[in-house]
Design a protein with these regions (language model features):
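SAM cofactor-binding core of SAM-dependent methyltransferases
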Residues: 1-27
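Class I S-adenosyl-L-methionine
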Residues: 28-38, 46-176
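Glycine-rich, N-terminal phosphate-binding loop of Rossmann-like dinucleotide-binding domains
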Residues: 43
Length: 176
């Protein structure tokens, strides 16, 4: 976390002893980073949000997507999940989103996306976000996104990953 106050709060709330840490995504040395199967990332939305100036990649915050792409290229996780504001879809007449999808596809990933609203998943607020999912194993196509409206009972089993084990709890999920 680049923001010193947010970093401090995170360390107060969570036990971070022994965690791998880098306070700025632009300075990550991927060879020092542990391997992983799933990369979950968000890049700053201000550059794409209708509430902001919508400067896109001309805004330094907008270029952080390319740092995420660098991590994906260097570490080659089986999956990635990215999140941002729906304004990303229409920014620069869709060219920005096309660049993002093309960049991820050129890295060898199958890429899907969908706009989801938190209110449809038991969260007491309406907050739309675009989710971008990528995976190396083509057998996952159509099994991650789109998915039906959440009912709080279970997740699908996906194939791939380094352990090849189930990635859902057999007893299902409870509503929040």
């Amino acid at each position: 976390e680049a923001d010193a106050y947010a970093d401090h709060n995170y360390r107060v709330l969570f036990d971070t002893e022994g965690e791998w840490f880098c306070n700025d995504a632009r300075n990550i040395e991927t060879e020092r980073m542990p391997d992983f199967d799933l990369l979950c990332a968000g890049f700053p939305c201000q550059a794409f949000s209708i509430a902001g100036r919508r400067e896109g990649f001309a805004d330094a915050r907008g270029t952080l997507f390319f740092e995420v792409a660098r991590l994906v290229a260097d570490k080659r996780p089986a999956y990635f999940l990215l999140e941002n504001v729906p304004g990303l879809l229409s920014h620069d007449k869709g060219r920005t989103f096309h660049t993002i999808l093309s960049t991820l596809s050129e890295l060898g990933y199958h890429v899907e996306w969908k706009v989801l609203n938190s209110k449809d998943f038991g969260v007491p607020q309406s907050r739309k976000r675009v989710y971008i999912v990528g995976y190396l194993d083509g057998r996952c196509a159509g099994k991650i996104l789109p998915f039906p409206k959440a009912n709080g009972t279970a997740l699908i089993q996906v194939h791939a990953g380094k352990q090849g084990e189930r990635v859902y709890a057999e007893e299902g999920l409870s509503c929040t």
